[in-house]
């Protein structure tokens, strides 16, 4: 896997306009409710899922994974400084939404296949993976 320290620092990916627009897109793709479980692979600072959590008043804090331990990460999520394959292979949790955004292109083909296979098996009924 590749480490790109602070690659999205102060860019459009962190802008409120982009975050709101992306969450609007997510909510058009999948019906989520306050008891939905959300995982964001390559979450960066976690702003997207933190905003989604606030919007839906999620009961369970969303989980964000990133290989970079950002100092200014959101306090509204459970942040795990780990690689996706390690976490997703070990967790017993199932999710209604798994986001893999701005990340998958950093993986090798073999890692992508393995990650998608494991993610598929970690979805609740009617859960979705959004890439």
Residue ranges and their predicted role:
Residues 45-86:
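Class I SAM-dependent methyltransferase SAM/SAH-binding core
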Residues 2-21, 25, 29:
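Class I SAM-dependent methyltransferase Rossmann-like catalytic core
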Residues 35-44:
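Conserved class I S-adenosyl-L-methionine
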Residues 99:
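A conserved beta-strand element that flanks and buttresses the S-adenosyl-L-methionine
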Residues 86-92:
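Short conserved loop adjoining the S-adenosyl-L-methionine
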């Amino acid at each position: 896997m590749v480490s790109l320290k602070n690659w999205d620092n102060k860019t459009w990916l962190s802008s409120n306009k982009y975050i709101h627009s992306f969450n609007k897109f997510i909510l058009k793709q999948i019906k989520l409710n306050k008891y939905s479980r959300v995982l964001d692979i390559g979450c960066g600072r976690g702003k997207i899922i933190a905003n989604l959590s606030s919007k839906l008043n999620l009961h369970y804090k969303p989980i964000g994974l990133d290989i970079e331990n950002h100092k200014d990460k959101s306090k509204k999520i459970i942040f795990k400084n780990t690689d996706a394959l390690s976490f997703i292979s070990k967790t017993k949790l199932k999710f209604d939404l798994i986001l893999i955004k701005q990340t998958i292109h950093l993986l090798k083909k073999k890692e992508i296949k393995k990650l998608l296979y494991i993610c598929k098996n970690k979805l609740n009924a009617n859960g979705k993976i959004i890439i």
